[in-house]
């Protein structure tokens, strides 16, 4: 049994949905059972969810997918459940510091954001590009830098304005941030939030 825990809705057309679709692909494999819970905040609630999946559903592998789930939540539950494997999406794991039943994975999104920046550099007429992001954590900052450097490789005098919404799934704030940047002359946008509403708006 594999447990999937999502910080937002599993149909957000973005981060959570990509994990959900991967879980559904696994579900089709013989002998694999998937349990999942969506909209689990980065609080004690995720510890209750993880422990419930272990105790009630028999999960032996958990994918708590949000950045803020790692410390202290995954670490605390992992210490109490040595026979369960925890795989965290966030690149926070350190073999020297963390339990052996914990690991992490993360994609090289910054490489794609660099290419997005190159495209933005060719597309912008105002030489003002924008980035709407959830939180100023290392992975997000790396993406902002990559996007900006990609754009500057095309037009060195481009500026990139950034607005942080404070959380991963805040569609209203994301739309407000995008509109605010547009009012400042930004004409090309990207994001590092869970869903693509900011781009659609």
Language-model segments: residues:
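A residue-level marker of the well-folded mature domains of exported/periplasmic proteins
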Residues: 1-201
């Amino acid at each position: 049994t594999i447990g999937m825990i999502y910080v937002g809705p599993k149909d957000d057309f973005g981060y959570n949905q990509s994990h959900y679709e991967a879980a559904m692909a696994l579900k089709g494999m013989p002998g694999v059972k998937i349990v999942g819970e969506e909209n689990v905040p980065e609080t004690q609630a995720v510890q209750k969810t993880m422990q419930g999946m272990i105790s009630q559903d028999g999960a032996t592998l958990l994918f708590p997918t949000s950045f803020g789930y790692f410390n202290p939540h995954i670490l605390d539950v992992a210490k109490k459940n040595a026979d369960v494997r925890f795989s965290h999406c966030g690149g926070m794991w350190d073999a020297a510091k963390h339990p052996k039943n914990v690991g992490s994975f993360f994609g090289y999104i910054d490489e794609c954001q660099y290419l997005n920046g190159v495209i933005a550099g060719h597309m912008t007429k105002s030489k003002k590009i924008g980035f709407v992001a959830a939180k100023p954590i290392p992975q997000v900052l790396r993406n902002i830098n990559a996007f900006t450097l990609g754009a500057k490789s095309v037009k060195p005098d481009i500026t990139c304005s950034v607005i942080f919404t404070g959380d991963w799934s805040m569609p209203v704030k994301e739309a407000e941030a995008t509109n605010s940047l547009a009012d400042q002359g930004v004409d090309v946008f990207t994001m590092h939030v869970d869903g693509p509403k900011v781009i659609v708006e």
